[in-house]
Curated annotation (Swiss-Prot):
An annotated Gene Ontology molecular function: GTP binding
Species of provenance: Arabidopsis thaliana
UniProt xrefs under NCBIfam families: small_GTP
Gene expressing this chain: RABG3A
Lineage: Eukaryota, Viridiplantae, Streptophyta, Embryophyta, Tracheophyta
Keyword DNA damage in annotation: no
Name this protein carries in UniProt: Ras-related protein RABG3a
Protein backbone atom coordinates (compact mmCIF):
# COMPACT_ATOMS: atom_id res chain seq x y z
CA UNK A 1 0.00 0.00 0.00
CA UNK A 2 1.40 3.40 -0.96
CA UNK A 3 2.60 5.71 1.80
CA UNK A 4 0.77 9.03 1.96
CA UNK A 5 2.97 11.95 1.01
CA UNK A 6 3.63 14.44 3.76
CA UNK A 7 3.45 18.02 2.53
CA UNK A 8 5.83 20.61 3.97
CA UNK A 9 4.53 24.17 3.87
CA UNK A 10 6.73 27.14 4.68
CA UNK A 11 5.03 30.11 6.34
CA UNK A 12 6.76 33.40 7.14
CA UNK A 13 5.45 35.56 10.00
CA UNK A 14 6.33 39.26 9.67
CA UNK A 15 5.62 42.43 11.61
CA UNK A 16 7.17 45.02 13.90
CA UNK A 17 9.00 43.98 17.06
CA UNK A 18 6.68 43.46 20.02
CA UNK A 19 3.46 42.77 18.10
CA UNK A 20 3.34 39.19 19.41
CA UNK A 21 4.63 37.08 16.52
CA UNK A 22 6.52 34.64 18.75
CA UNK A 23 3.66 34.52 21.27
CA UNK A 24 1.16 33.59 18.55
CA UNK A 25 3.42 30.81 17.31
CA UNK A 26 4.06 29.45 20.81
CA UNK A 27 0.35 29.51 21.60
CA UNK A 28 -0.49 27.69 18.38
CA UNK A 29 2.24 25.03 18.54
CA UNK A 30 2.87 24.60 22.29
CA UNK A 31 -0.29 26.10 23.86
CA UNK A 32 1.92 28.30 26.03
CA UNK A 33 1.97 32.04 26.68
CA UNK A 34 4.53 34.14 28.55
CA UNK A 35 4.19 37.77 29.64
CA UNK A 36 7.97 38.17 29.40
CA UNK A 37 9.09 39.78 26.17
CA UNK A 38 12.20 38.41 24.50
CA UNK A 39 13.18 39.82 21.12
CA UNK A 40 13.78 37.32 18.34
CA UNK A 41 17.32 37.55 17.00
CA UNK A 42 17.63 36.77 13.31
CA UNK A 43 15.11 34.03 12.54
CA UNK A 44 13.81 30.81 14.05
CA UNK A 45 11.04 28.36 13.21
CA UNK A 46 8.61 25.92 14.79
CA UNK A 47 6.70 23.07 13.17
CA UNK A 48 3.24 21.62 13.60
CA UNK A 49 1.54 18.72 11.87
CA UNK A 50 -2.12 18.83 10.95
CA UNK A 51 -4.58 17.00 8.75
CA UNK A 52 -6.30 18.95 5.98
CA UNK A 53 -8.77 16.76 4.17
CA UNK A 54 -6.85 13.70 2.95
CA UNK A 55 -3.50 15.41 3.28
CA UNK A 56 -1.01 15.28 6.16
CA UNK A 57 0.61 18.69 6.37
CA UNK A 58 3.67 19.91 8.26
CA UNK A 59 3.62 23.66 8.79
CA UNK A 60 7.09 25.16 9.10
CA UNK A 61 6.43 28.57 10.64
CA UNK A 62 9.28 31.06 10.48
CA UNK A 63 9.55 33.80 13.09
CA UNK A 64 11.70 36.67 11.85
CA UNK A 65 13.01 39.61 13.84
CA UNK A 66 11.12 42.85 13.42
CA UNK A 67 14.20 45.02 13.82
CA UNK A 68 15.27 46.82 10.67
CA UNK A 69 18.88 45.71 11.03
CA UNK A 70 17.78 42.11 10.49
CA UNK A 71 15.73 42.75 7.37
CA UNK A 72 18.80 41.97 5.27
CA UNK A 73 18.35 38.33 6.34
CA UNK A 74 15.14 38.32 4.34
CA UNK A 75 16.07 36.83 0.99
CA UNK A 76 17.46 33.60 2.45
CA UNK A 77 14.52 33.05 4.77
CA UNK A 78 11.64 34.32 2.64
CA UNK A 79 12.31 32.36 -0.55
CA UNK A 80 10.34 29.18 -0.96
CA UNK A 81 7.53 30.46 1.27
CA UNK A 82 4.00 29.22 0.57
CA UNK A 83 2.24 31.94 2.60
CA UNK A 84 3.11 35.07 4.57
CA UNK A 85 1.35 36.20 7.76
CA UNK A 86 1.54 39.94 8.51
CA UNK A 87 1.03 40.73 12.20
CA UNK A 88 0.33 44.06 13.88
CA UNK A 89 -0.73 45.21 17.36
CA UNK A 90 -4.24 46.71 17.35
CA UNK A 91 -3.06 49.07 20.13
CA UNK A 92 -0.08 50.48 18.20
CA UNK A 93 -0.90 52.48 15.07
CA UNK A 94 2.68 52.45 13.80
CA UNK A 95 2.69 48.64 13.66
CA UNK A 96 -0.40 48.77 11.44
CA UNK A 97 0.99 51.53 9.22
CA UNK A 98 4.11 49.42 8.72
CA UNK A 99 2.14 46.51 7.22
CA UNK A 100 2.61 48.11 3.82
CA UNK A 101 6.38 48.11 4.30
CA UNK A 102 6.44 44.47 5.42
CA UNK A 103 4.18 43.50 2.51
CA UNK A 104 6.49 45.17 0.00
CA UNK A 105 9.62 43.87 1.72
CA UNK A 106 8.39 40.28 1.51
CA UNK A 107 7.52 40.50 -2.19
CA UNK A 108 10.88 42.11 -2.92
CA UNK A 109 12.92 39.51 -0.99
CA UNK A 110 10.87 36.38 -1.73
CA UNK A 111 10.43 37.11 -5.45
CA UNK A 112 7.32 34.88 -5.88
CA UNK A 113 6.47 33.87 -9.45
CA UNK A 114 3.22 35.88 -9.32
CA UNK A 115 3.36 38.66 -6.68
CA UNK A 116 -0.26 39.68 -7.31
CA UNK A 117 -1.67 36.29 -6.32
CA UNK A 118 0.82 35.24 -3.64
CA UNK A 119 -1.17 34.44 -0.46
CA UNK A 120 -0.96 36.71 2.57
CA UNK A 121 -2.97 36.75 5.78
CA UNK A 122 -3.23 39.63 8.28
CA UNK A 123 -3.48 39.15 12.05
CA UNK A 124 -4.50 42.03 14.32
CA UNK A 125 -3.08 40.82 17.64
CA UNK A 126 -3.40 41.81 21.33
CA UNK A 127 -7.12 42.54 21.27
CA UNK A 128 -7.17 41.52 24.96
CA UNK A 129 -5.11 44.51 26.19
CA UNK A 130 -7.05 46.68 28.68
CA UNK A 131 -10.25 44.95 27.65
CA UNK A 132 -10.02 46.60 24.25
CA UNK A 133 -9.97 50.17 25.59
CA UNK A 134 -6.40 50.80 24.36
CA UNK A 135 -7.25 49.90 20.80
CA UNK A 136 -6.34 52.44 18.11
CA UNK A 137 -6.81 50.41 14.90
CA UNK A 138 -10.44 49.57 14.15
CA UNK A 139 -11.42 46.30 12.51
CA UNK A 140 -12.91 48.34 9.64
CA UNK A 141 -9.61 50.11 9.00
CA UNK A 142 -7.79 46.77 8.92
CA UNK A 143 -10.45 45.16 6.73
CA UNK A 144 -10.27 48.09 4.28
CA UNK A 145 -6.48 47.72 4.02
CA UNK A 146 -6.83 43.99 3.37
CA UNK A 147 -9.51 44.59 0.73
CA UNK A 148 -7.34 47.13 -1.08
CA UNK A 149 -4.43 44.68 -1.16
CA UNK A 150 -6.13 41.79 -2.91
CA UNK A 151 -8.77 40.76 -0.35
CA UNK A 152 -6.27 39.37 2.16
CA UNK A 153 -7.94 37.21 4.86
CA UNK A 154 -8.02 39.04 8.21
CA UNK A 155 -8.22 37.74 11.79
CA UNK A 156 -8.23 39.52 15.13
CA UNK A 157 -6.29 37.48 17.66
CA UNK A 158 -5.10 37.26 21.24
CA UNK A 159 -2.10 35.04 21.91
CA UNK A 160 -2.67 35.55 25.64
CA UNK A 161 -6.31 34.38 25.61
CA UNK A 162 -5.79 31.92 22.74
CA UNK A 163 -8.51 33.70 20.77
CA UNK A 164 -8.73 32.92 17.04
CA UNK A 165 -5.16 31.55 17.02
CA UNK A 166 -6.03 28.04 15.80
CA UNK A 167 -8.54 29.42 13.31
CA UNK A 168 -6.00 31.87 11.88
CA UNK A 169 -3.27 29.26 11.44
CA UNK A 170 -5.70 26.76 9.92
CA UNK A 171 -6.57 29.38 7.30
CA UNK A 172 -2.85 29.99 6.80
CA UNK A 173 -2.30 26.24 6.26
CA UNK A 174 -5.20 25.92 3.81
CA UNK A 175 -4.09 29.03 1.92
CA UNK A 176 -0.51 27.80 1.75
CA UNK A 177 -1.66 24.36 0.59
CA UNK A 178 -3.76 25.89 -2.18
CA UNK A 179 -0.81 28.00 -3.28
CA UNK A 180 1.51 24.98 -3.32
CA UNK A 181 -1.00 23.07 -5.46
CA UNK A 182 -1.22 25.95 -7.94
CA UNK A 183 2.58 26.13 -8.10
CA UNK A 184 2.74 22.39 -8.87
CA UNK A 185 0.31 22.81 -11.77
CA UNK A 186 2.18 25.90 -12.98
CA UNK A 187 5.57 24.20 -13.05
CA UNK A 188 4.21 21.02 -14.63
CA UNK A 189 2.89 23.16 -17.46
CA UNK A 190 6.25 24.83 -18.21
CA UNK A 191 8.98 22.18 -18.01
CA UNK A 192 11.45 24.40 -19.87
CA UNK A 193 11.05 27.39 -17.53
CA UNK A 194 14.37 26.80 -15.77
CA UNK A 195 16.43 26.84 -18.93
CA UNK A 196 14.56 29.88 -20.26
CA UNK A 197 15.41 31.86 -17.13
CA UNK A 198 19.05 30.75 -17.06
CA UNK A 199 21.29 33.80 -16.53
CA UNK A 200 23.59 34.70 -19.43
CA UNK A 201 26.87 32.88 -19.19
CA UNK A 202 25.37 30.60 -16.56
CA UNK A 203 25.88 27.41 -18.51
CA UNK A 204 24.47 25.44 -21.37
CA UNK A 205 20.69 25.29 -21.82
CA UNK A 206 20.85 22.29 -24.15
Amino acid sequence: MATRRRTLLKVIVLGDSGVGKTSLMNQYVHKKFSMQYKATIGADFVTKELQIGEKLVTLQIWDTAGQERFQSLGAAFYRGADCCALVYDVNVLRSFDNLETWHEEFLKQASPSDPKTFPFIVLGNKIDVDGGSSRVVSDKKAADWCASNGNIPYFETSAKDDFNVDEAFLTIAKTALANEHEQDIYFQGIPDAVTENEPKGGGCAC
